[in-house]
Amino acid sequence: MKPQDLKLPYFWEDRCPKIENHVFYVPSYYPKYEEFVMPSWQNLFANEGPVCCELCSGNGDWVVEQALKDTSINWIAVEKRFDRVRKIWSKMSNHKVNNLLIVCGEAQTFFTHYVTDASFQKIVVNFPDPWPKFRHRKHRLFQDVFVQDMVRVLVEGGQLTLVTDDHTYLTNSIQVMLNYLSPGMQDPYYVNVKDNYGGSWFENLWRSKGEKIFCTEFVKRVGI
């Protein structure tokens, strides 16, 4: 299957939440999110295995590799750009991956309206846009409200991982996560990832430019 074989299932004026071809479409600026009844993960994946979630999935190289590596774990790939969703879907289809659901939409909207408490064993955020300019800071993913939402959907003992090439974004995000989660690494709470992290297109891009790759991990405290 080619990326262009996946067609958007509605025109903008007819947009609505919809699951089709292993893609969950979560449109922007939609006033009736709550009218869509989200199936359980067990129904979506046809099993009761653990569910992990990748945010900022890009072209899908990393998450498809993870899904193929261990088919007992279910994965959700969240990517807001439809051109990238198409590429993830193409890889998923060609590799016959059955333990992956793609979410086409904003992570915040998906979590707020469709992810119940204690849903995920792990959340991995790979190379999010750092929005480095101060006037764009409201767009940054690692802000208090959304970090609290990520904590909400993690199981007790669940893990939140951030991988980025932007050191300033890394340290700012760590300061936010320290308010709600326990660090999984010793101070300064991150490592420089020297080995191949898993075939991410963005990892390959930044390494080709000589950039360092940083990783931090946090764990949900019992009782949160």
UniProtKB/Swiss-Prot annotation:
The lineage of its organism: Bacteria, Pseudomonadati, Chlamydiota, Chlamydiia, Chlamydiales. It comes from Chlamydia muridarum (strain MoPn / Nigg). Substrate binds at K133, D165. Belongs to the class I-like SAM-binding methyltransferase superfamily. TrmB family. This is tRNA (guanine-N(7)-)-methyltransferase. Keywords: Methyltransferase, S-adenosyl-L-methionine, Transferase, tRNA processing. PANTHER family: 3-DEOXY-D-MANNO-OCTULOSONIC-ACID TRANSFERASE/TRNA GUANINE-N 7 - -METHYLTRANSFERASE, PENTACOTRIPEPTIDE-REPEAT REGION OF PRORP DOMAIN-CONTAINING PROTEIN. Transmembrane segments: none annotated. One of its GO terms (molecular function) is tRNA (guanine(46)-N7)-methyltransferase activity. It holds the Pfam family Methyltransf_4. The keyword Protein biosynthesis does not apply. InterPro entries: SAM-dependent_MTases_sf, tRNA_(Gua-N-7)_MeTrfase_Trmb, tRNA_methyltr_TrmB_bact. Pathway: tRNA modification; N(7)-methylguanine-tRNA biosynthesis.
